[in-house]
From Swiss-Prot:
Family: Belongs to the PHP family.
Domain of life according to the entry: Bacteria
Sites where the protein binds Zn(2+) 1: H7, H9, E73, D192
The UniProt record lists the keyword Ubl conjugation: no
Lineage, top ranks: Bacteria, Pseudomonadati, Pseudomonadota, Gammaproteobacteria, Enterobacterales
Molecular functions per Gene Ontology: phosphatase activity; zinc ion binding
EC number: 3.1.3.-
Keywords: Hydrolase, Metal-binding, Zinc
The UniProt record lists the keyword Ligase: no
GO biological process: bacterial-type flagellum-dependent swarming motility
Official protein name in the record: Probable phosphatase PMI1003
Length: 245
């Protein structure tokens, strides 16, 4: 079990089915020390209003020894790489994930998908790119991995993509992991949990990474401190409540 999950959705995204309290309970039960709540950005049809994200600090930082990161899974909106998380919003969040989602932007083809993703990565607003292996959005994998490493942005291996979402992602994800390794970048593990019982479930992703002998030191989730140092390298403030993690 990895002690950190960076991608989870609550009932604030109405196609997800668990509360923040239920996530804390599952995290404690599973031995997870740190998780991020990353509900969908406001351009998604059933996403929360932007006030949801600005009000996240009402949630206690620590509950029963488990820490929470205030986050968002933003939507990439166009070829310019713009996302539905403004710079003002980003400054109030601990972590910003971003990815392609059909209801907000359909595939533009490999060349323009790649341009959009590179623009998002280089914007300075995003720390993790979610499910980049989605076969609906072909990209130049090597080029994206190169730019992601340059800007210290992690590319996600999304467990949900191997189970019930984004069917056909596995081949692309293997190539992404290899490209990240060649480029000297980082992989982030995400359960993409839409129900609390899935928190920390990386089973299928880890099977794939084991097949290619992907090194642990290039996986972001191996410790809370590694994640927190990564976020501080992106200009995020130190969280005093997590000093012991």
């Amino acid at each position: 079990m990895y002690p950190v999950d960076l991608h989870a959705h609550t009932i604030a995204s109405t196609h997800a089915y668990s509360t923040v309290s239920e996530y804390f309970q599952q995290a404690k039960k599973k031995g997870i020390k740190l998780f991020a709540i990353t509900d969908h950005g406001p351009d998604m049809d059933d996403a929360p209003h932007e006030w949801h994200f600005s009000n996240l600090p009402v949630i206690p930082r620590m509950v029963d020894g488990v820490g929470i990161l205030y986050g968002i899974e933003a939507n990439i909106k166009n070829i310019k790489g713009e996302i539905d998380c403004t710079e003002k919003m980003s400054k109030k969040l601990d972590i910003v994930l971003a990815g392609f989602h059909d209801p907000v932007m359909g595939s533009l083809g490999m060349v323009d998908n790649t341009k959009a993703l590179i623009a998002t990565i280089s914007s300075g607003l995003v720390q993790v790119i979610t499910h980049p292996g989605n076969p609906k959005y072909p990209i130049d994998i090597k080029e994206v991995a190169k730019v992601a490493a340059e800007f210290n942005v992690a590319l996600e291996m999304n467990n949900s993509s191997f189970i019930h979402s984004r069917v056909g992602s596995e081949k692309n994800c293997i190539e992404i992991a290899k490209a990240v390794l060649d480029a000297g970048g980082l992989i982030a593990l995400g359960s993409d949990s839409h129900i609390a019982s899935s928190l920390g479930n990386f089973e299928r992703v880890l099977e794939v990474l084991a097949e290619i002998q992907f090194p642990q030191q290039k996986i972001l989730n191996t410790s809370p401190r590694k994640v927190l140092d990564f976020l501080q390298a992106h200009g995020k403030k130190e969280i005093t409540a997590f000093q012991h993690l």
